[in-house]
Amino acid sequence: MECPFCKRFHDTPKQIVDASKGNVNWQWKHMPLDFHNPAAHKEALAAECIAEQKGNRGFWVFVNDIFHHTQGNGGGVADLASVVTGVGADLDAFRECLGSGKYEDKVEADIQKAKSYGVNGTPATFVVGWHNHTGKSQLLGGAQPAQAIMAVMRKMMIESQQDDSANQ
């Protein structure tokens, strides 16, 4: 969450999901880059600890608040505790979770999965085939505008419909 391009891109997924009327979902995967660490890695772990306490909505509110408060480029958040309490999380439970390292494996698995798909920078977006059944996906690197992502989605939807018609 230290990536300045991710910060710029952050509102784009919400715009797409909101405009989709329930047809699009967005899944977050962590990929703290080495030159943004240790702040980016700590924020990834922190987001998971918030999700444990506050659920999916709490996770997204926290991520939004981190993007709002971070100095960026590895500078971190000056007062992480205030961001934590600002989303209504219990600070002691959060500190215990963060100190336990219980989400280290999850964050590392996200990093390794991204690398296995050829992702080497952030943000990165995978558009997965229409209704997730085509098996097709396309990687879009960088802070793409909503229109570019929507164009790929439309193309995949049309291809899926053509494939369905051909198979009938």
Q: Could you describe each region identified by the protein language model?
A:
Residues 11-17, 81-168:
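C-terminal cap of thioredoxin/glutaredoxin-like
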